[in-house]
């Protein structure tokens, strides 16, 4: 015979060693460990084929209380039960129910029946209601009252399969005997194994007899079918093998599902439970009490007028046969009902599964069992799956799409994907990218990473350009609009004076130094026609302003002084106008001056392609005088004529779009911006976005301070309602709602912050080395505050241009508004100076600046600010040392003086010799020594200096190698202030 070890058989079956040992124990084969040797008979007992079960019907019942009988039968339809019961022999069908006690073993002893394996059958748990005493009561359920707490002996396994068909024939409640317990049945002698087979047909009719319902209390006596479950019945075990059981005093052996029962030896009896034995969990008298180790939901008794709740159907199985076969766990107690037969207590006595569960705990893991179901509820416990491995779930396809906005950090991407950040960092290293958890990833890199982990990246970045893209207008919706005219030219050529004369106002009187330092927008009406003027600064620092003015304008008036001619800013204005493709009208101003030369101006402008119409060109030239108001109307007529030629049109019925011409921070009104509406109509209450700021139009004013409710195309207005001061030149767009405007502004702020962080990124090793090499470079930090955004921008740009290789000027902060305590604190922390342009510090800020020693400088003319900063930067430069020649003396004689060393008698040939100066010793025009004079004497007196033509005695410090003919050259080093 071939011998097989336990672990070899487990490998062949594809199961664990412990699981195979548990199956062997269930089959009655005792093994010590996984190295135990199995005989062929053991293997056959473990995997015996299924056989057709006997037609014996085992009616298992237990009297929980006088009016409640718990029964277990096959769970099929009544018609199927009748069909199954038909093949039974006639003699078996005629067996009366009253003869049942003769074939049924009492609780104390019961003959085992040979068990045959059958296909999985269905079982029902039927709860019977109290009924009157029937004519014939099944004696198998009779039990003395005093033995109620005791536990019945287990039924043979052979009754397990036949018990199921009995339930099919008895869907109606069966009568429960009430007085049978009074008569104690005698215990017949044990029978041979064949006796139960013969008794089985008689038992098959028992459910049929009991099936007849009582007419009394039809509703209460109706049985409730709580569930239906597949119960696998293992194959029959060879009869010659003894059943492996452990029997303790006062309790029956523990039945195991799937364990074939052997045939009991004749002449032996099972020990019956003693009346005073321990009460099992869920025994009668404790309704609803949860069994500790037994089957959940054991019956509760104690009151004869109320049935106990049945066990929950969906409790997990206590043994693993079903689980091993891949089936769903059988309902708690279902397997025991089928196995216990007619007298194997259906766990109602509480101890039905106690031993089994303990055996399981010895062989398998502990299983959680829910407590008993509360009375009156029909719900089921959730099934507790045991022994399952952790299942790796894969998210749905829609869950594997990650939406990002242009960029995402490594940590955020890992969180969205549900993986560890270290895994992403490791994947980035493979791609050659050294990143940290806060490292931002662009869309392409994130896509590569996500693909490796089975995810997709979707770019949901806000497309600002697409949202703010101007929609083309239909030709029929375009209406004529006023022209926008920008006045440009060199400083002091009379641009603002000309505009004042046109507007009949005195704007220049309010400008510091008589020069324009911010851009202005004005609306002028001439003969019923409107013209919008933009006045730009002419100073070189305001190049950006002039460029913005040229971009938003339709016509440029180039002002040139007749007595000064073309200047640098004049050339710049011409270049800006040509770059913007704007037509130019030349206004030759100051023709009232005696030295005016309009012809010279026309000739100089020809170099730039501006040829007068009088000379055959296309450029309009008008000779005007702003001071004397000469030819002003002619100039305006030329402007209107040029506008008619351009056919300027716009759609006033759409959302407003425009440009921020100028912006400032008003103490009472907050941020105020001058907006030039270019298309559409801006109304009060409209939401808008401009650059990184957004807001709502709270109020609008024109250039005269009058309140305006709506501003159409080519109309300049001051808008109040920004959440911050916008930059001059920002595009102003009216939005449909605040949410969209805020979203766009926040998106732009994020992009601006990213660009600023990129500028201040960490130094590379090469950059660090260069910085160390340039350690002598000094920094001057400055904070710029101004009245309007354009002026602040101009001053900051002028200061940045002052930076050199020796000293670098850093503008830490530039904003609009008064100098505040925050500015002073920033300056104190960074050792910066504060430059105020047309603003004053607050009282508290001034006191704090004095306390902290912060240098605050106030200006109203840009020239002064630039000059002072130059001086401050020069003060930071290290002074240079320059050698200054003093004189020369020739050694005529050398003397040795005690305690003084060698003394040279010299004659001063040039300049003078100074006592504290430095001296060189020259021999054959070669420097032999350079140091200081030790002494300078004339005769015996120490002197400070000796002039030309005099003799003196000289000695050197720590040097005595003096020879006749050597030359003393006297000099000194003087400091020279550094220059930029």
UniProtKB/Swiss-Prot annotation:
Chain segments carrying region G5: 625-627
Region (G2): 514-518
GO MF, one annotated term: GTPase activity
G3: annotated segments: 535-538
Subcellular locations according to the entry: Cytoplasm
Residues that, per the record, bind GTP: 489-496, 535-539, 589-592
Nucleotide-binding keyword on record: yes
Region (G1): 489-496
Annotated ranges, domain tr-type G: 480-647
Compositional bias annotation for Basic and acidic residues: 53-64, 95-113, 209-219, 262-272, 352-368
Source domain of life: Bacteria
InterPro entries, alphabetized: EF-G-like_DII, IF2_II, IF2_N, P-loop_NTPase, Small_GTP-bd, T_Tr_GTP-bd_dom, TF_IF2_bacterial-like, TIF_IF2
Keyword terms of this UniProt record: Cytoplasm, GTP-binding, Initiation factor, Nucleotide-binding, Protein biosynthesis
Ranges of Low complexity composition bias in the record: 78-94, 127-141, 156-171, 194-208, 280-294
Region named Disordered: 47-382
Gene3D superfamilies for the chain: 1.10.10.2480, P-loop containing nucleotide triphosphate hydrolases, Translation factors, Translation initiation factor IF- 2, domain 3
GO cellular component: cytosol
The protein's role, per its UniProt record: One of the essential components for the initiation of protein synthesis. Protects formylmethionyl-tRNA from spontaneous hydrolysis and promotes its binding to the 30S ribosomal subunits. Also involved in the hydrolysis of GTP during the formation of the 70S ribosomal complex.
PANTHER family found in the cross-reference section: TR-TYPE G DOMAIN-CONTAINING PROTEIN (PTHR43381:SF5), TRANSLATION INITIATION FACTOR IF-2-RELATED (PTHR43381)
Protein family according to the UniProt entry: Belongs to the TRAFAC class translation factor GTPase superfamily. Classic translation factor GTPase family. IF-2 subfamily.
HAMAP family: IF_2_B
Identification of the protein by name: Translation initiation factor IF-2
Organism: Geobacter sp. (strain M21)
Taxonomic classification: Bacteria, Pseudomonadati, Thermodesulfobacteriota, Desulfuromonadia, Geobacterales
């Amino acid at each position: 015979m071939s011998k097989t070890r336990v672990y070899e058989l487990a490998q062949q079956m594809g199961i664990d060693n412990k699981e195979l040992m548990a199956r062997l124990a269930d089959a009655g084969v005792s093994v010590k460990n996984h190295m135990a040797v199995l005989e062929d008979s053991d293997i056959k007992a473990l995997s015996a084929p299924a056989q057709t079960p006997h037609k014996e019907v085992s009616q298992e019942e237990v009297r929980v209380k006088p009016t409640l009988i718990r029964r277990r039968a096959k769970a099929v339809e009544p018609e199927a039960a009748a069909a199954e019961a038909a093949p039974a022999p006639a003699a078996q069908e005629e067996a009366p129910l009253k003869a049942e006690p003769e074939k049924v073993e009492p609780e104390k002893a019961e003959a085992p029946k040979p068990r045959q394996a059958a296909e999985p059958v269905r079982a029902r748990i039927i709860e019977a209601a109290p009924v009157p005493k029937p004519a014939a009561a099944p004696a198998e359920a009779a039990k003395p009252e005093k033995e109620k707490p005791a536990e019945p002996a287990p039924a043979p396994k052979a009754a397990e399969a036949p018990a199921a068909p009995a339930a099919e024939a008895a869907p109606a409640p069966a009568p429960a005997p009430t007085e049978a317990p009074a008569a104690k049945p005698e215990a017949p002698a044990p029978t041979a194994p064949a006796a139960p087979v013969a008794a089985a047909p008689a038992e098959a009719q028992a459910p049929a007899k009991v099936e007849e319902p009582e007419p009394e209390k039809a509703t209460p006596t109706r049985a409730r079918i709580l569930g239906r479950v597949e119960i696998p019945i293992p194959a029959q075990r060879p009869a010659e093998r003894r059943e492996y059981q452990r029997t303790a005093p006062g309790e029956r052996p523990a039945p195991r599902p799937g364990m074939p029962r052997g045939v009991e030896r004749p002449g032996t009896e099972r020990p019956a439970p003693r009346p005073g034995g321990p009460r099992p969990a869920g025994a009668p008298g404790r309704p609803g009490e949860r069994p500790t180790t037994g089957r959940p939901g054991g019956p509760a008794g104690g009151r004869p007028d109320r049935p106990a709740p049945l066990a929950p159907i969906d409790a997990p199985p206590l043994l693993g046969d079903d689980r091993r076969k891949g089936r769903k766990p059988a309902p708690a107690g279902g397997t025991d009902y089928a196995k216990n037969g007619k007298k194997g207590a259906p766990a109602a006595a509480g101890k039905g599964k106690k031993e089994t569960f303990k055996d399981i705990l010895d062989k398998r893991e502990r299983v959680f069992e829910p407590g008993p179901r509360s009375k009156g509820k029909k719900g089921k416990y959730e099934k507790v799956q045991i022994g399952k491995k952790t299942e790796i779930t894969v998210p749905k396809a829609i869950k594997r799409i990650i939406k990002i906005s242009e960029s995402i950090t490594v940590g955020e991407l890992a969180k969205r994907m549900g993986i560890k950040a270290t895994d992403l960092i490791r994947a980035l290293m493979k791609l050659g990218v050294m990143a940290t958890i806060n490292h931002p990833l662009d869309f392409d890199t994130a896509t590569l990473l996500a693909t490796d982990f089975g995810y997709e990246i979707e770019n949901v970045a806000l497309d600002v350009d697409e949202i703010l893209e101007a929609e083309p207008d239909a030709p029929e919706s375009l209406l004529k609009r006023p022209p926008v005219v920008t006045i440009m030219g060199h400083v002091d050529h009379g641009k603002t004076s000309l505009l004042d004369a046109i507007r009949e106002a005195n704007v220049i009187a309010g400008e510091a130094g008589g020069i324009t330092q911010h851009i202005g927008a004005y609306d002028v009406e001439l003969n019923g026609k409107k013209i919008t003027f933009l006045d730009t600064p002419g100073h070189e620092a305001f190049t950006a302003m002039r460029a913005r003015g040229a971009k938003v304008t339709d016509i440029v008036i180039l002002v040139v002084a007749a007595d000064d001619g073309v200047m640098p800013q004049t050339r710049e204005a011409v270049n800006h106008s040509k770059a913007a493709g704007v037509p130019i009208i030349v206004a030759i101003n100051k023709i009232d001056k005696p030295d005016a030369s309009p012809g010279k101006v026309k000739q100089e402008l020809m170099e730039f392609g501006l040829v007068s119409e009088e000379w055959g060109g296309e450029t309009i030239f008008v000779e005007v005088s702003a001071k004397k108001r000469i030819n002003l109307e002619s100039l305006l007529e030329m402007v209107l004529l040029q506008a008619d030629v351009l056919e300027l049109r716009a759609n006033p019925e759409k959302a407003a779009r425009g440009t921020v011409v100028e912006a400032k921070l008003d103490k009472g009104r907050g941020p105020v911006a001058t907006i030039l509406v270019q298309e559409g109509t801006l109304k009060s209450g409209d939401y808008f976005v401009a650059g990184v700021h957004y807001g709502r139009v709270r109020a609008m004013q024109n250039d005269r301070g009058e309140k305006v409710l709506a501003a159409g195309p080519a109309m300049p207005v001051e808008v109040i309602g920004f959440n911050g001061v916008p930059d001059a030149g920002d595009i102003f767009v009216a939005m449909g709602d605040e949410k969209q405007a805020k979203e766009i502004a926040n998106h732009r702020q994020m992009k601006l912050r990213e660009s600023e962080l990129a500028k201040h990124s960490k130094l590379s090793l090469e950059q660090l080395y260069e910085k160390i090499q340039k350690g002598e470079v000094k920094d001057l930090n400055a904070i710029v505050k101004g009245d309007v955004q354009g002026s602040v921008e101009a001053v900051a740009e002028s200061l940045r241009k002052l930076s050199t290789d020796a000293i670098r000027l850093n503008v830490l902060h530039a904003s609009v508004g008064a100098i505040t305590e925050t500015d002073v604190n920033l300056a104190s922390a960074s050792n910066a100076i504060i430059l105020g342009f047309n603003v004053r510090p607050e009282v508290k800020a001034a006191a704090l600046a004095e306390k902290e020693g912060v240098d605050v400088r106030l200006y109203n003319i840009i020239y002064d600010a630039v000059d002072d900063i130059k001086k401050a930067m020069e003060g930071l430069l290290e002074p240079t040392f320059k050698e200054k020649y003093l004189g020369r003396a020739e050694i005529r004689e050398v003397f040795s003086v005690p305690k003084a060393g060698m003394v040279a008698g010299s004659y001063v040939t040039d300049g003078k010799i100074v006592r504290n100066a430095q001296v060189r010793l020259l021999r054959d025009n070669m420097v032999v020594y350079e140091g200081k004079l030790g002494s300078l004497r004339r005769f015996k007196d120490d002197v400070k200096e000796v002039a030309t033509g005099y003799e003196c005695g000289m000695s050197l410090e720590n040097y005595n190698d003096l020879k006749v003919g050597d030359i003393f050259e006297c000099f000194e080093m003087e400091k020279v202030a550094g220059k930029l």
